[in-house]
Design a protein with these regions (language model features):
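Alpha-helical cap/lid subdomain in secreted, periplasmic
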Residues: 136-152, 161, 165-299, 358-360, ...
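Short, solvent-exposed loop/turn segments at secondary-structure boundaries
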Residues: 126-131, 193-197
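N-terminal secretory targeting modules
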Residues: 2-9, 14, 21-116, 123-129, ...
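Conserved Rossmann-like nucleotide-binding pocket used by diverse enzymes
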Residues: 17, 154
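Catalytic nucleophile serine of serine hydrolases
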Residues: 121-122, 157-159
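Structural cue for short, hydrophobic secondary-structure segments
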Residues: 117-118, 185
Length: 428
């Protein structure tokens, strides 16, 4: 750890995954591979022709759909209701509705239903507050619409966190509350800087939620930055693989701005977070989808979404966080202390706070874990952030840098440290 005067490093948690995060290895002989190549070569001309025809057909269909949407366009005003065009634009994937129909039937029967939300700062309510964020608005609408039912509301949004952190905290923060319906929003927190990791994390997150004991329905949400930056397309690949619903606030807002009905500042006070009117639109889009499913609920039956085959080759599943409150085999020495207060949405952390070389040389934080994949959460600081070398089984795997001088604020960062072929005991 290499900064004098006052050096700070906070280890929030160790992220471990016991299963998942390993590719499915297959083997084949050289002759089989050669045969496959030859067959592919012989049919390449026909395949190319078929693909070209299919692409042309898709393009024509897409153009016709666009014409239909434009023909039905109605101007939107912030103080009015959503237009049908906005609703249509939001339906990135209608999805399999069987589980959602089951939830709606419970609501209609006046039963108790737990509705959970997991995501980043947008879900948490930044720029709108706890009572006017899209999550609370949606839960309140459900309670008002199905007044005989009892709605339990769980908001597991934490700012500056993406799917990688999400898949490791979902069991404790959300699934432990036994949700019947879960909304997932991470499209501005997941970035292309870690595309594969984020895709595998999002895949694992959806799989973990889907396979949990209460068999919850899932509705995914796509949001956006002002310039259109979003992980929507990458998430959509996974969502469509499982045929889950995806509601795109991104598509709706950018299209409404393009038509000149609103400007970005109408729905956001910065370049990312919806403000109160923006959160209202997110919730209204979700309400519209649920209402449409309700109208047809008696006709919805059959098989649920099929999660047999993962969408990615190595989804990160069964993750958990080792924090001070739950740690059983952790040793902190020297200037590392254990603190119980909250930071960045997480309860408790290990804090290094040293001022001399002696503090540094006498300080260590050691975990013993049984895991297949290991990561770490640590705090980034706008001042006095230091560095720390991280070893796994006596091998240096990375150096963490907690310095975020000149940044927008302190936050929790994550680092994927190392993955193994199978779960086992490791020292970090």
């Amino acid at each position: 750890m290499k900064k004098r005067i006052l050096a700070v490093l906070i280890a929030t948690a160790l992220a471990v995954s016991v299963t998942g995060c390993a590719g499915n290895a297959t083997s084949s002989s050289d002759s089989t591979s050669a045969s496959s190549v030859a067959e592919s070569s012989d049919t390449s001309t026909q395949t190319s022709s078929d693909a070209s025809s299919e692409d042309e057909s898709k393009n024509e269909s897409s153009q016709e759909e666009s014409k239909d949407l434009e023909a039905n366009y109605t101007k939107y005003t912030l103080d009015g209701d959503l237009t049908q065009h906005m609703i249509d634009m939001s339906r990135l994937n209608e999805g399999n509705k069987v589980r959602l129909a089951n939830v709606i039937k419970k609501l209609k029967n006046g039963e108790e239903v737990t509705v959970g939300f997991i995501g980043g700062s947008i879900t948490q309510g930044t720029s709108a507050g706890n009572d006017l964020c899209y999550a609370k608005l949606t839960a309140d609408w459900l309670q008002k619409t199905y007044s005989n039912a009892k709605i339990n509301y769980v908001n597991a949004g934490i700012g500056a966190t993406g799917s990688y952190i999400g898949v490791h905290r979902v069991a404790n923060d959300l699934l432990s509350k036994n949700p019947d319906l879960v909304f997932v929003e991470f499209s501005v927190n997941d970035t292309t800087e870690n595309t594969e990791r984020n895709k595998k994390s999002y895949d694992g997150l959806l799989r973990t939620i889907w396979k949990s004991s209460t068999n919850p329905a899932i509705i995914t949400i796509a949001t956006t930055q002002e310039d259109g930056t979003s992980f929507q397309d990458q998430h959509a690949e996974i969502v469509k693989h499982y045929d889950l619903p995806m509601i795109s606030y991104r598509n709706t807002i950018l299209d409404t701005i393009k038509h000149g009905d609103i400007v970005w500042k109408d729905i956001s006070d910065d370049n990312i977070h919806p403000n109160v009117p923006g959160h209202k639109i997110v919730s209204q889009l979700l309400q519209a989808y649920i209402s449409d499913v309700d109208k047809d609920v008696d006709n919805i039956s059959g098989s649920e979404s099929d999660f047999t085959t993962p969408a990615t080759d190595a989804p990160i599943e069964n993750g958990s966080l080792i924090q001070p409150s739950s740690a059983t085999d952790v040793t902190a020495t020297g200037a590392f202390g254990n603190y119980e207060q909250q930071f960045g949405g997480f309860d408790g952390f290990w804090l290094f706070k040293g001022t001399s070389d002696a503090d540094i040389s006498a300080t260590s934080l050691t975990f013993k874990v049984n895991a297949k994949s290991i990561g770490i959460l640590y705090h980034k600081y706008t001042k006095a952030g230091c560095t720390a070398d991280v070893y796994i089984d006596d091998e240096l795997v990375t150096t963490l840098n907690a310095d975020f001088t000149g940044g927008w604020g302190n936050y929790v960062e994550c680092a994927e440290l190392k993955s193994f072929d199978s779960a086992g005991e490791h020292t970090v």
